[in-house]
Curated annotation (Swiss-Prot):
<dbReference type="GO" id="GO:0005198">
    <property type="term" value="F:structural molecule activity"/>
</dbReference>
<keyword id="KW-0597">Phosphoprotein</keyword>
<keyword id="KW-0899">Viral immunoevasion</keyword>
<dbReference type="GO" id="GO:0030430">
    <property type="term" value="C:host cell cytoplasm"/>
</dbReference>
<keyword id="KW-0862">Zinc</keyword>
<dbReference type="GO" id="GO:0019028">
    <property type="term" value="C:viral capsid"/>
</dbReference>
<comment type="similarity">
    <text>Belongs to the geminiviridae transcriptional activator protein family.</text>
</comment>
<dbReference type="InterPro" id="IPR000942">
    <property type="entry name" value="Gemini_AL2"/>
</dbReference>
<keyword id="KW-0863">Zinc-finger</keyword>
<feature type="short sequence motif" description="Nuclear localization signal">
    <location>
        <begin position="13"/>
        <end position="28"/>
    </location>
</feature>
<comment type="subunit">
    <text>Monomer. Homodimer. Homooligomer. Self-interaction correlates with nuclear localization and efficient activation of transcription. Monomers suppress local silencing by interacting with and inactivating host adenosine kinase 2 (ADK2) in the cytoplasm. Interacts with and inhibits host SNF1 kinase. Binds to ssDNA.</text>
</comment>
<feature type="region of interest" description="Transactivation">
    <location>
        <begin position="115"/>
        <end position="129"/>
    </location>
</feature>
<comment type="function">
    <text>Strong activator of the late viral genes promoters. Enhances the expression of the capsid protein and nuclear shuttle protein. Acts as a suppressor of RNA-mediated gene silencing, also known as post-transcriptional gene silencing (PTGS), a mechanism of plant viral defense that limits the accumulation of viral RNAs. Suppresses the host RNA silencing by inhibiting adenosine kinase 2 (ADK2), a kinase involved in a general methylation pathway.</text>
</comment>
<feature type="modified residue" description="Phosphoserine; by host">
    <location>
        <position position="109"/>
    </location>
</feature>
<keyword id="KW-0945">Host-virus interaction</keyword>
<keyword id="KW-0238">DNA-binding</keyword>
<dbReference type="GO" id="GO:0052170">
    <property type="term" value="P:symbiont-mediated suppression of host innate immune response"/>
</dbReference>
Length: 129
C-alpha cells in the first residue's frame, strides 16, 4: 500500500491538450458601423444591441471561404424579415461626445477663495522675509 502523500495530483496539461484540440466554432459578422463581432455557432437566432441598433444573428448572414482563409465571400440567403431594428428607447449615437459646459464660478467642492490682489503689501512682506 502506498502512502497517499507520495501520490501526485493529476497533471492539468492533459486536460489543456484535450481542450486545445477542438477549435471553438464561431462566425464573424461585419456590421454597417465597421465593427466586427464573432458569434458562437450554438448561439443561433439570438439578438443583441450595438450602438442603439438591434441586430438579429440569424442564418441570413454567414461567411464561407474559398481557397485561402483570407479570401472571404459573403453569401446572403433569402431574408425572412428585417434584421436591423431601430430601438427608439436608446439615444442615437453621435460621433462627437458632448462635453460639459465650463462654469465661471468656483467648483462646489472648493470654498470660495479670496483673490490674491485683495491682500495688502504688509501681508506679502511678512511671507517673503
Amino acid at each position: 500500500m502506498q502512502n497517499s502523500s507520495l501520490l501526485k495530483p493529476p497533471s492539468i496539461k492533459a486536460q489543456h491538450k484535450i481542450a486545445k484540440r477542438r477549435a471553438v466554432r464561431r462566425r464573424r459578422i461585419d456590421l454597417n458601423c465597421g465593427c466586427s463581432i464573432f458569434l458562437h455557432i450554438n448561439c443561433a437566432d439570438n439578438g443583441f444591441t450595438h450602438r442603439g441598433e438591434h441586430h438579429c444573428s440569424s442564418g441570413r448572414e454567414f461567411r464561407f471561404y474559398l481557397g485561402g482563409s483570407k479570401s472571404p465571400i459573403f453569401q446572403d440567403t433569402t431574408r425572412r424579415g428585417p434584421v436591423v431594428h431601430q430601438n427608439q428607447d436608446l439615444p442615437h449615437p453621435s460621433p462627437v461626445q458632448p462635453q460639459p459646459t465650463e462654469s465661471i464660478g468656483s467648483p462646489q467642492s472648493l470654498l470660495q477663495l479670496p483673490s490674491l490682489d485683495d491682500f495688502d503689501e504688509s501681508f506679502w512682506a511678512d511671507i517673503f522675509k
